[in-house]
Amino acid sequence: VKLYGYFRSSAAYRVRIALNLKKLPYDHEAVHLTRDGGWQWREEYRAINPQKRVPSLALSTGEVLLQSLAIIEYLDEVFPEPPLFPADAIERAQVRAVAQIVACDIHPINNLAVLNYLKGPLKHDQAAADDWYRHWVVQGFDAVEALVRPGPYAFGTHVTVADLCLVPQVFNARRLKVDMAKYPKIAAADAACLKLPAFDKARPENQPDAE
């Protein structure tokens, strides 16, 4: 398979972790989101992903999968070991809730396209854009901190999709100077995950396109 991604993209980071946990080899194709106006706008990439976002996962069949959570669910269904969702239905719903707080509430209003719109047409400066980012991360993390049950991962002794979403978000939260001291449970789960080779290999600084 081939993963189209960007080293600092939270969404691509989630999929890298999933591929590593499943021990699935993949080719990395960089889609630099800021260089030369953004490679995602090029015609050749628009033909792969009409949404012009990352990640995209190209399968050996020729099919291309979009959206990180959809890709992760596909990988978990086709390659079930190790499972990324609990067997119990209630626990699955709880894990999905945290994953979706990150992927559906925090991330969409803080992605590069939104931040560029704030700084471009809406004429906010970088400091204002950073404040915007931190505001929504804090609001989301306040909820997540109340929901996770580290032991040592977000929901116990097994890594789940909640961890796959939290670790990339914590990386970018720290980059934008969110005070993680307020979130000891999130920080503990993040630290436990990053001790695992699959997570370490997926870190942004370990990617071929890292800057």
Label every PLM stretch briefly.
Residues 102-195:
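GST-like fold's C-terminal all-alpha helical module
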